């Protein structure tokens, strides 16, 4: 199971978290996010990674911005309102499409990307907020999603204290944690991060 730790802002923490065994390290390129990092900082973070892949999270980006980031990052995670036509401009094996889930009607959006074999990340919907809300998706809905598609990364309120119980109910392709493992936005509690990774990897 893939473990993604998102919202990293400090190169030193990126190195530590990579050594803990995180598969993916996520950086936020959305300027309105409290976890925003610029291109130069992203390059510094990339240099610190051991075996982890770097995921650049974008929100409603331009074509040019994505192409620039693909020269640095291993994956692009589209976390805004990007449609399938835009996402299909890029190699599907380097793309993750985040879908903010409120209720069962959102399953149709997931199917759209499933039909193209594009990895999907599901996050809890919160009006006007793109990720990092700390809110959870209903477990029954989460199970329907992961039963429907085998390339789903789950996120939203995941922590070292609840991940074991959640994974007793759902079997996703991957898990993504951010805000619940922080001291402050962009600064991780490394003890919590290590516990989270260990719990997932030692299942």
Curated annotation (Swiss-Prot):
Superkingdom of origin organism: Bacteria
The name this protein goes by in its record: N-(5'-phosphoribosyl)anthranilate isomerase
Annotated HAMAP family: PRAI
Residue stretches in coiled coil: none
EC number(s) recorded for this UniProt protein: 5.3.1.24
UniProt-listed CDD domains: PRAI
GO molecular function per UniProt: phosphoribosylanthranilate isomerase activity
Keyword annotations of the record: Amino-acid biosynthesis, Aromatic amino acid biosynthesis, Isomerase, Tryptophan biosynthesis
UniProt entry tagged with the keyword Thylakoid: no
Annotated pathway: Amino-acid biosynthesis; L-tryptophan biosynthesis; L-tryptophan from chorismate: step 3/5
GO BP annotation list: L-tryptophan biosynthetic process
PANTHER family hit by this protein: N-(5'-PHOSPHORIBOSYL)ANTHRANILATE ISOMERASE
Gene3D superfamilies: Aldolase class I (3.20.20.70)
Protein family (similarity comment): Belongs to the TrpF family.
Matches recorded under InterPro entries: Aldolase_TIM, PRAI_dom, RibuloseP-bd_barrel, TrpF_fam
Reaction equations catalysed: N-(5-phospho-beta-D-ribosyl)anthranilate = 1-(2-carboxyphenylamino)-1-deoxy-D-ribulose 5-phosphate
């Amino acid at each position: 199971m893939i473990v993604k730790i998102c919202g990293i802002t400090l190169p030193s923490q990126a190195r530590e978290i990579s050594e803990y065994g995180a598969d993916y390290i996520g950086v936020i390129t959305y300027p309105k996010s409290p976890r925003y990092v610029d291109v130069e900082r992203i390059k510094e973070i990339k240099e610190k990674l051991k075996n982890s892949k770097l995921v650049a999270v974008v929100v409603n980006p331009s074509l040019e911005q994505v192409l620039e980031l693909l020269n640095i990052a291993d994956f692009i995670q589209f976390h805004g309102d990007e449609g399938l036509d835009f996402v299909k401009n890029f190699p599907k094996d380097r793309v993750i499409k985040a879908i903010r889930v409120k209720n069962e009607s959102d399953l149709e959006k997931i199917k759209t990307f499933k039909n193209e074999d594009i990895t999907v990340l599901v996050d809890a919907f919160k009006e006007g907020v793109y990720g990092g809300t700390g809110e959870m998706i209903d477990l029954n809905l989460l199970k329907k999603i992961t039963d429907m598609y085998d390339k789903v990364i789950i996120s939203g309120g995941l922590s070292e204290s609840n991940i074991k119980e959640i994974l007793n109910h759902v079997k996703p392709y991957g898990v993504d944690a951010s805000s619940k493992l922080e001291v402050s936005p962009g600064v991780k509690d490394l003890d919590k991060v290590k516990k989270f990774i260990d719990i997932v990897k030692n299942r």
